[in-house]
């Protein structure tokens, strides 16, 4: 190899390395910065955009509560019963304290007012929200439901509480009885736990399953395996023909005070969420 050929080869190699370095620099600078929203599992993440320097994967994959429907049912005078059905799509996450608010609007879509309350929701639960006898100075045409930020709690191997309703019935009251109509039934606690409070929501539907009226009551201090009668009374005449009665029983398993102290032995595993 002549001296001139060697010189040409060296110049060619230098030119190649300069172009390669420039190309690598352009490629590096054109790459998006690593983030927790780039859709790529990088920067020591445990999953895509979660774990490591990003939020925990279980929090990233938690879904919002779904609002299935809402309705304002006219009650006595200027009062309404506000009703919604919601669903928690998360199989192992729930919350013992969920802050929510109903906003109600008139026929011209003007906000009339709002009503706030607290509830709880269990993993994978579909439930009703009821606010009874809420005052409104104008007729309610539209009802909206929203939630504040929820502090989720995880339950491993969750099984829903076995609370059953039997012998439910609805009847009109006689003139000798106080009120217009009444729903009743038997609540059975088939869990292994003694609960301090169990909520019962009652919905009356017509033959088209349109909501006519709602009511609510509660059962206190129901032991494991025990059953208890419940009654709810409507004092105002209900417009429409009642064809179906839906009754939902639920209890807050996230509240330690809701579990009555066992007489013997250690607390059940169900409380260890």
Question: Where in the sequence are the language-model features?
Answer:
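N-terminal Lys/Arg-rich, disordered targeting/topogenic segments
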Residues: 1-8
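Proline/serine/threonine-rich low-complexity linkers at boundaries of modular beta-sandwich domains
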Residues: 29-30, 55-64, 154-163
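The feature marks the first
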Residues: 60-116, 130, 194-196, 203
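Short structured motifs
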Residues: 65-72, 86, 113-117, 130, ...
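Surface-exposed interaction/gating patches
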Residues: 78-93, 150-214
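Intrinsically disordered, low-complexity Pro/Gly/Ser/Thr-rich segments with frequent PxxP/GP/PP motifs
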Residues: 110-138, 212-238
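Terminal connector regions
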Residues: 134-174, 231-273
């Amino acid at each position: 190899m002549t001296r001139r050929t060697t010189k040409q080869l060296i110049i060619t190699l230098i030119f190649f390395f300069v172009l390669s370095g420039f190309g690598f620099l352009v490629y590096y600078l054109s790459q998006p910065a690593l983030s927790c929203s780039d859709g790529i599992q990088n920067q020591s993440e445990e999953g895509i955009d979660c774990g490591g320097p990003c939020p925990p994967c279980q929090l990233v994959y938690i879904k919002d509560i779904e609002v299935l429907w809402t309705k304002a049912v006219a009650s006595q005078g200027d009062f309404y019963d506000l009703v919604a059905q919601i669903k928690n799509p998360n199989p192992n996450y729930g919350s013992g304290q969920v802050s929510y608010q109903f906003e109600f609007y008139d026929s011209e879509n003007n906000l009339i007012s709002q009503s706030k309350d607290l509830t709880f929701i269990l993993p994978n639960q579909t439930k009703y929200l009821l606010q009874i006898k809420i005052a409104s100075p104008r007729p309610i045409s539209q009802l909206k439901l929203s939630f504040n930020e929820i502090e989720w709690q995880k339950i491993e191997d969750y099984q829903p509480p076995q609370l059953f309703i039997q012998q439910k019935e609805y009847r009109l009251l006689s003139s000798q009885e106080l009120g217009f109509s009444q729903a009743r039934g038997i609540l059975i606690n088939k869990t292994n736990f003694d609960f301090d409070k169990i909520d019962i929501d009652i919905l009356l539907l017509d033959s088209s399953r349109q909501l006519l009226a709602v009511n609510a009551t509660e059962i206190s201090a129901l032991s494991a395996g025990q059953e208890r009668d419940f009654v709810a009374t409507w004092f105002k005449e209900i417009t429409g023909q009642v064809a179906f009665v839906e009754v939902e029983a639920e209890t807050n398993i996230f509240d330690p005070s809701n579990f009555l102290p066992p007489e013997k032995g250690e607390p059940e595993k169900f409380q260890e969420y």
